[in-house]
């Protein structure tokens, strides 16, 4: 199974995530399978109200993965716990490196 979809021409990747809002702490768990699709499981402290959790997802992932906030965009699932994130300006090798700890 693919953990992400990478476009080498644009240097972008799409990554599915499953978010638990209003958690005790911000944390990245592991990949889980939902409806035969791999999702990276996240816990976020912010509540899912008025886009606060979405904003915290971007801030948290940018900090954790040492990426610019502007290179992360939620493209699907703005009002759902299942989301798709577009990561821009990233090498596939670096993406594999940052995702490796979450692959069990």
From Swiss-Prot:
Report which superkingdom the organism of origin falls in. Answer: Bacteria
Please give the InterPro entries that the UniProt record associates with this protein.
DUF167 (IPR003746), YggU-like_sf (IPR036591)
Q: What family name appears in the similarity comment? A: Belongs to the UPF0235 family.
Q: Which Gene3D superfamilies match?
A: YggU-like (3.30.1200.10)
- What name does UniProt use for this protein? UPF0235 protein A1I_04385
């Amino acid at each position: 199974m693919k953990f992400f979809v990478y476009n080498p021409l644009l240097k972008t990747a799409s990554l599915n995530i499953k978010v638990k809002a209003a958690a005790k702490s911000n944390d990245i768990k592991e990949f889980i399978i939902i409806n035969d699709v791999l999702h990276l499981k996240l816990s976020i402290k912010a509540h899912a109200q008025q886009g606060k959790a979405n904003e915290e997802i971007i801030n948290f992932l940018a900090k954790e993965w040492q990426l610019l906030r502007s290179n992360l965009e939620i493209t699907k699932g703005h009002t759902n716990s299942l989301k798709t994130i577009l990561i821009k300006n990233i090498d596939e090798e670096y993406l594999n490196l940052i995702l490796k700890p979450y692959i069990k």
